[in-house]
């Protein structure tokens, strides 16, 4: 099981260079398992025991397995994650021609570690909107090949480089795509038109707009002397998306189960398809009776917010509280913050720990050092919108928000096992 899950994760990461592609990958796997699409613009008539999914903006998805009995009896089991990761996004008018090189201007998306983006073989993917035969349409594209790079400045020209330096995103992050003659002018949208023709065999009249991200072309891989680790891009938080999907597909219970994977978590979640938007609430309102029954059902429900945790780094162990240093390959982490940066409370943490113990899955705890600030997740946002009890958990990771992150190769199986047990659980606290 562990090897198959790790292989599947690596394939999922490769197919998901952007939130749009991650959502498409999730859709493909859900449809293969018999899930049917619900269009938000249509009237819904879901069947008891039916399996459905809803997408919004092509970058967020909610999968629903309706139970054979009313969710009012035993509530809804929900797992939440997010599809986006920090990256470099292409600007609307990106063409830069400097010193005989074609470069593209980029905007930093989210809280990215910038230094690792230098000297990497980069490709470009995302969504392109165009006009064809008088109609406005959109398609996903992925160049796949390494078409760009951000070369470092040689140490001979920057003698203090190893002492740390502030990276200027405006001046230092535009990737190089090609050499060009002095009088040659490159139209980036024309390049996108060519890519649409190559990838989809369609001829666009004009490219109207796009949402494109650079990404590292190096595939995720099992690494380490004993294969103890998985290294790859976008583990935060496609690792949790994949774990939630595998658990949902494996759960054969009669309970109502939901997997929600939102976009825009890395930039605050405040969007129509983000956790701070109405997508999940609106979806549940259309599936559940209004008023009293809706509120009662949510009060019987529970959300597991799954987002990677900071593993204790052997070179920087003092960055963790001495009693709360999660270790790689030692199981999922219950994340606690008394200032509500995480939504965990004693009841939800106790229930998750109970599930882990019952499944013989190791479990850990994380609390940030008292002299450091704490990040957050979709957990508190979802809890405050729905009033649903929530526990924040995640798998330990190194190099979070780097272009290449690291997790334990045993932990995915641990998380899938306990999330499957959660979906199958007959009673919630």
From Swiss-Prot:
Name used for this protein in its record: Probable M18 family aminopeptidase 2
BP terms from Gene Ontology: proteolysis
EC top class, as a word: hydrolase
NCBIfam families registered for this protein in UniProt: PRK02813.1
Disulfide bridges in this chain: none
Binding residues for Zn(2+): 82, 156, 401
Top-rank lineage group of the source organism: Bacteria
InterPro entries on file: M18_aminopeptidase_2, Peptidase_M18, Peptidase_M18_dom2
Molecular function per GO: aminopeptidase activity; metallopeptidase activity; zinc ion binding
Cofactor(s) the record lists: Zn(2+)
A cellular component term, taken from the record's GO annotations: cytoplasm
Keyword Hydrolase appears in the UniProt entry: yes
Entry's family note: Belongs to the peptidase M18 family.
